[in-house]
């Protein structure tokens, strides 16, 4: 076991500073949000328990009577956020495993057994996960008072309400570390460590058009029967609506990956610059890596496109909206934008992590282009196109698609909601593009090694 610890220490020391900081941040941010999301669910649950014992707890027209509805919304938001949180933790582990063939080969050549070599890599990832969990827990604790700026059910969210407790803090920290270990182990399964060297197994991923075809069929069916279903009654209409929306959720990943693959092929064929051609080919070669960066943002954007104009239209309905209804509608809007903002923050860091992985994985390509005389900023411009174009199309497009999907249930109006949703999408795209600039130090380090090799 001492050999494994020594090997893990050697791997830690071989890390560059930029990758180490990014790996810790990729563990810390999702852990902080995981604790905050858990605290929010617990806060609404505690409020519902108190409301159930109040005099108006059985009155569905009062805020106390709607407390259980808020709990349901909190669980729904938590479900939406848990996917990008887990994905980011896994991506942080993959960042630790990228381009480690040389380090692993050195450990193998000095006599460390293949199993112990892999265990050392897993241990190294767990060390970064522990540091990330500690930093994330501190970030969560420090930001607790800031939640008081948000008001739900007519009163602010208190720091004491958002505190999850020591037990939940320890359990979720352990869960994040176990997720890192599992992700690292799965990544190591793709690495072959033999006496002759170290190599990664790779499989060419296929992109199927089945998902987009099903999505188009579902959208056409909904636009055809949606209005009719709503005329049959609220219960029947909502059941049909939720059924169609659930079916679209099941195939959203297939649609997203296929769309990015198609977009990449179009960019490569229609390109008028070498940067655009390289960006398009990289997107077409690995559309799943691009989708992982902001797929969750596109999904939540679809929901914002559905719900925000709808609630805005309801709030403009006139005399039927009493004070309680206005509070509930305002809380729904606020909750959706909060969920979207958290997803954007996760998506931005996820973009930085996944782009760093792609930089490390394409190090040989960067070196080859540099030897051929490519300008220093060539790959940076290509990378910006690779991030900005699909981010804009997928995030803004998903919101617009959500608004189209909701059109059978909406009357005229909702213009304010449309503008707010669209502005949020544009801000999200800008944030993701800015986050991708975190890969610049890595690329400069690779180019510096090329210049040293020439000298």
Language model feature labels by segment:
Residues 75-92, 342-349:
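Long, hydrophobic alpha-helical segments
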Residues 51-61, 147-164, 320-325, 405-420:
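Short juxtamembrane loops and helix-capping segments at transmembrane helix boundaries
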Residues 1-83, 323, 327:
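Membrane transport/envelope proteins' first extracytoplasmic loop
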């Amino acid at each position: 076991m001492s050999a494994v610890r020594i090997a893990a220490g050697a791997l830690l020391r071989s890390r560059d500073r930029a990758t180490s900081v990014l790996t810790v941040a990729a563990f810390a941010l999702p852990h902080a949000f995981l604790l905050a999301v858990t605290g929010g669910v617990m806060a609404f649950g505690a409020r519902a328990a108190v409301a159930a014992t109040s005099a108006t707890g059985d009155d569905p027209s009062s805020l106390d009577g709607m407390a259980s509805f808020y709990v349901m919304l909190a669980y729904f938001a938590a479900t939406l956020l848990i996917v990008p949180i887990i994905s980011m933790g896994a991506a942080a582990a993959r960042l630790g495993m990228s381009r480690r063939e040389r380090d692993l080969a050195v450990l193998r050549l000095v006599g460390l057994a293949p199993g112990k070599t892999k265990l050392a890599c897993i241990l190294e990832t767990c060390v970064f996960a522990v540091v990330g969990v500690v930093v994330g827990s501190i970030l969560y604790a420090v930001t607790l008072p800031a939640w008081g700026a948000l008001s739900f059910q007519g009163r602010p969210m208190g720091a004491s309400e958002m505190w999850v407790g020591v037990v939940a803090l320890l359990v979720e920290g352990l869960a994040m570390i176990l997720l890192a270990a599992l992700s690292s182990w799965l990544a190591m399964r793709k690495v072959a460590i033999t006496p002759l060297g170290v190599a990664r197994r790779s499989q060419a991923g296929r992109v199927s058009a089945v998902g987009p075809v099903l999505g188009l069929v579902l959208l056409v069916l909904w636009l055809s029967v949606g209005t009719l279903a709503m005329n049959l009654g609220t219960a029947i209409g909502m059941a049909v609506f939720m059924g169609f929306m659930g079916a679209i959720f099941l195939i959203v990943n297939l649609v997203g990956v296929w769309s990015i693959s198609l977009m990449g092929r179009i960019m490569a064929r229609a390109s008028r610059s070498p940067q655009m051609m390289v960006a398009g080919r990289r997107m077409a070669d690995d559309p799943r890596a691009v989708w992982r960066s902001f797929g969750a943002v596109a999904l939540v954007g679809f929901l914002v496109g559905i719900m925000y104009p709808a609630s805005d239209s309801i709030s403009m309905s006139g005399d039927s909206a009493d004070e309680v209804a206005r509070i509930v509608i305002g809380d729904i809007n606020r909750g959706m934008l909060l969920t979207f903002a958290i997803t954007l923050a996760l998506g931005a860091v996820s973009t930085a992590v996944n782009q760093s992985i792609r930089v490390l994985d394409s190090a040989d390509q960067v070196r080859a282009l540099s030897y051929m005389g490519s300008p220093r900023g060539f790959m940076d411009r290509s990378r910006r196109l690779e991030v900005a174009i699909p981010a804009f199309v997928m995030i803004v497009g998903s919101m617009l698609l959500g608004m189209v999907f909701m059109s059978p249930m909406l009357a005229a109006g909702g213009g304010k909601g449309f503008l707010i949703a669209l502005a949020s999408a544009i801000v999200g795209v800008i944030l993701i593009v800015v986050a991708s600039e975190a890969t610049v130090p890595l690329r400069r380090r690779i180019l510096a090694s090329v210049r040293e090799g020439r000298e």
